[in-house]
């Protein structure tokens, strides 16, 4: 798969297969194409060459396909993107009601279940501005789970958080992984990666430079660029 922004090629010859229940962590320096890669998976960014197939559905120009895939692919960003004028509960029920046409009562039951799952059930009636950054990011995870996705994409979900709030978000992600969620996570949290990832991907200059099982990646990286990166962040 290839992608350009104008004349600049941001993704070069990406070849990746993700199996159900697999946990992949993508790392690499700033500007290496990590975020663009996962944003292409649910068509937030459009790729120019190659195929992206999610659960048997190819991501093409067909908006019906795009909508179907987006309903199956949850996404959590650096910024929480919660609606400030809606309660936490209403933030979580919005998509199931409007996209899945779920009755409000069912959507609320589902939302409360996932708010409990991310350990924030007691904040359901509050508004985003009343919550800490870590709490808001956990709400964002619950909101994505309310669409009952088959895969979750995380784009540096802790990078905008104060250090003391990072652990509460990572704990939720660890639990998700243990419960069998298929996950692709862009992060520099290498402790999390060692605990959760089945496979590590290192990207640089728009390419997958190294792809390996987690233990092998940390114990015996092959590429010099990977070795340098790990020496700087570990």
Whereabouts are the PLM-identified features?
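A general structural signal for well-ordered alpha-helical segments in protein cores
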Residues: 193, 226-227
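ATP phosphate-binding glycine-rich loop
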Residues: 223
């Amino acid at each position: 798969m290839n992608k350009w922004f104008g004349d600049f090629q941001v993704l070069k010859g990406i070849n990746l297969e993700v199996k159900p229940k697999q946990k992949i962590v993508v790392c690499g320096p700033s500007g290496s194409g990590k975020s663009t890669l996962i944003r292409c998976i649910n068509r937030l960014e459009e790729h120019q060459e190659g195929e992206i197939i999610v659960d048997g559905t190819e991501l093409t120009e067909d908006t019906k396909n795009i909508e179907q895939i987006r309903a199956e692919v949850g996404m959590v960003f650096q910024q929480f993107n919660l609606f400030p004028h809606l309660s936490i509960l209403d933030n979580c029920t919005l998509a199931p009601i409007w996209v899945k046409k779920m009755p409000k009562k069912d959507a609320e039951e589902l939302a409360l279940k996932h708010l409990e799952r991310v350990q924030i059930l007691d904040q359901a009636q509050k508004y985003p501005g009343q919550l800490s950054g870590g709490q808001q990011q956990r709400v964002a995870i619950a909101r994505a789970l309310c669409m009952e996705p088959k895969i979750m994409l995380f784009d540096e979900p802790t990078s905008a958080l104060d250090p003391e709030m990072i652990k509460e978000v990572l704990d939720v992600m660890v639990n998700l992984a243990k419960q069998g969620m298929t996950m692709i996570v862009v992060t520099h949290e290498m402790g999390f990666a060692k605990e959760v990832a089945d496979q590590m991907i290192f990207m640089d200059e728009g390419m997958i430079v190294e792809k390996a099982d987690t233990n092998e990646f940390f114990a015996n990286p092959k590429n010099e660029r990977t070795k340098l990166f790990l020496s700087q962040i570990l």
